[in-house]
Design a protein with these regions (language model features):
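Aromatic- and charge-enriched surface segment that lines or borders ligand/interaction sites
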Residues: 104-146, 288
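N-terminal lobe/hinge region of extracytoplasmic solute-binding protein
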Residues: 4, 60-109, 140
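Short, well-ordered beta-strand elements
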Residues: 54-64, 113-116, 166-168, 200-205, ...
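Ligand-site clamp/hinge motif
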Residues: 216-261, 404-406
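Bacterial lipoprotein signal-peptidase II cleavage site
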Residues: 23-31
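Append "and occasionally in soluble cytosolic enzymes with long acidic Gly/Pro-rich linkers
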Residues: 212, 290-396
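Gly/Pro-rich hinge or "lid" segments in bacterial periplasmic/extracellular proteins
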Residues: 76, 94, 170-238, 342-343, ...
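Detector for C-terminal structural segments
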Residues: 301-332, 386-395, 420-540
């Protein structure tokens, strides 16, 4: 099958499988809808003063003591602007489609053996033409980086043939494989260089404190700035102060994470979507969640819209299906049937045999004819305030239904230990999905995952149902897009109706600039400076 280079390839299942979920002190049972973002809109609110320019230059935070190498990816601050210095093999757009300005054509008949042809008119900043060997080398080295390793684990082998062609063999068929190759390109042999050569529109100055236009780049003349200045503001308080004083002009914040920072109100705030999915997971060996009815009932009791709009301050997109709502694979009509509905939750619990057998106002269940009091052990990682608040809300909603639930807010180490030991009935989780939307690692039966018995994988549900993995494999191997879409609908229905996991929402990130400084922003999860040539920067 042949693919033109700039034809969007709709992305499907993904997973880098970065779990973050639940946290510390025990909390008793008495404790206590956003549309896809329009990137050039700002948060409505109180009118604020116009920004007073500090220096009439555009500056970003960076870490001068860390490597600039985007393949080693050792500094989150320096990774924020990597796309200004380096091209990537493929680019993932905000609508989860994929394109490339480096790869002119790619072919695969079985989605295992892939052949890629590159544009050799592209040059590094020293004038050296880009070669297939450079691209293959960058991907090979990225496999060794913890930042990219999970998504590139699919690769069995890679090699270059001539100056403009390289081939990749994957371990299994994946029609969405190019979506995983959002990998920066460095020159062959530069992996251990802290400032490797790149082909992007900018290059690092000799002093290392600014980005200057790369005269070899085909888009250099389209860039909105001749120079982007870099300032060392790695100290948190210094970074906040520098932004408020306009010494730096753009910051990215994760309002749902443990490093959420507070910036003042004299800003314009834009959001961009991510593939980080929050969800509820269940221990299928727990006597409370042996049935799909009991698990699905919890889904009806979770007010996703309230969690996103109130507890996450709009920094999320509510979802009931295991794919981002902005994806073409998200079936809105089907999803609405599983939205927040306490009445449906009560009916589902009743169908699962959960009732008030002793008329004490709390629900019980029958186990071999014996009335058993409910006391669901719900765990969450305490490192994230947003996750803790969401878990508390869900705990509260279950208790209001008479489902006695106790929330345990655990440190990260204790949380992971509890998951591995199965010491939970329900957990609040997060997973960073890769842009092929592949969640099979959450369901793969453990005994067949690895010969390394110390590695248990992420099947914390302890399901032995091979149906999930089979559905994902069928979907990833489909030749035609229409068949892939139908296969993904089958995945969504199977996950939703068995309730092994219950998606809650997808995170969004904040991109903050000073008022009136930047327009035309179309940031993505993978590239803050996506389409930077279309930005307008005003420093007057």
């Amino acid at each position: 099958m042949r693919f033109p280079a700039k034809k969007p390839l709709i992305l499907i299942l993904a997973l880098t499988l970065l779990m973050t979920g639940c946290a510390g002190a025990r909390t008793g049972t008495q404790q206590a809808e956003e549309p896809p973002p329009v990137y050039d809109q700002v948060i409505p609110g109180t009118e604020v003063k116009e920004r007073q320019p500090a220096d009439h230059v555009f500056s970003l935070n960076y870490d001068p003591n860390a490597s600039m190498n985007p393949v080693r990816a050792e500094s989150s601050a320096n990774m924020q602007f990597w796309s200004l210095l380096y091209d990537s093999v493929f680019t993932v757009d905000s609508d989860w489609s994929v394109r490339s300005e480096v790869v002119t054509e790619w072919t695969s008949d079985d989605f295992i053996w892939w052949v890629f042809h590159i544009d050799t008119s592209i040059c590094f900043s020293d004038g050296t033409p880009l070669s297939a060997a450079d691209v293959a080398y960058s991907i090979q080295r990225a496999q060794q980086s913890s930042y990219y390793a999970n998504r590139l684990d699919i690769i069995y082998g890679i090699s270059a043939f001539g100056s403009d062609t390289f081939a990749v063999t994957t371990k299994y068929a994946n029609s969405q494989f190019p979506a995983l190759l959002n990998i920066p390109i460095i020159k062959k042999g530069d992996y251990f260089e802290d400032r490797p050569l790149g082909t992007g529109p900018y290059m690092l100055s000799e002093e290392g404190d600014r980005l200057i236009l790369n005269p070899e780049n085909r888009h250099a003349a389209e860039m909105p700035l001749d120079t982007v200045y870099l300032r060392d503001c790695m100290d948190t308080s210094a970074r906040i102060r520098a932004f408020e004083e306009a010494a730096i002009d753009l910051v990215v914040n994760d309002p749902t994470g443990m490093y959420n920072l507070g910036y003042g109100s004299s800003n314009e705030t834009r959001y961009f979507d991510t593939s980080n999915m929050h969800y509820l997971g269940f221990n299928t060996t727990s006597m409370y969640f042996l049935t799909a009815a009991a698990r699905c009932a919890v889904g009806f009791a979770a007010d996703r819209d309230a969690i996103v709009s109130t507890l996450m301050s709009g920094c999320g997109v509510a979802a009931t299906l295991p794919v981002h709502p902005a994806s073409g694979y998200y079936d809105e009509d089907y999803a609405r049937g599983f939205a927040f509905n306490p009445e449906n939750a009560a009916v589902m619990f009743a169908n699962a045999g959960v009732r008030d057998y002793d008329e004490d106002g709390q629900l019980e269940m029958l186990v071999t004819g014996i009335v058993v009091e409910l006391n669901i052990r719900f765990i969450v990682n305490s490192d994230s305030t947003a996750k803790v608040l969401a878990a508390r809300k869900i705990c509260e909603q279950l208790n209001e239904l008479g489902i006695t639930t106790t929330l345990y807010e655990l440190t990260w180490a204790d949380y992971i230990a509890a998951l591995e030991a199965g010491e939970f009935d329900m957990y609040y989780g997060e997973i960073r999905m890769t842009p092929d939307w592949n969640l099979s690692e959450l369901f793969r039966p453990r005994e067949n995952r690895s010969k390394d018995l110390t590695f248990q994988g992420m099947n914390y549900a302890q399901t032995r149902d091979y149906g999930y993995v089979d559905l994902y494999e069928k979907y990833l191997g489909e030749q035609e897009e229409s068949a892939r879409r139908e296969d993904f609908q089958a995945i969504s229905r199977y996950i939703t109706e068995t309730g092994i996991i219950l998606p809650l929402c997808f995170e969004r990130r904040e991109l903050l600039t000073h008022r009136g400084v930047a327009t035309g922003i179309s940031a993505t999860q993978y590239d803050v400076f996506h389409n930077f040539n279309e930005w307008t920067i005003n420093l007057e």
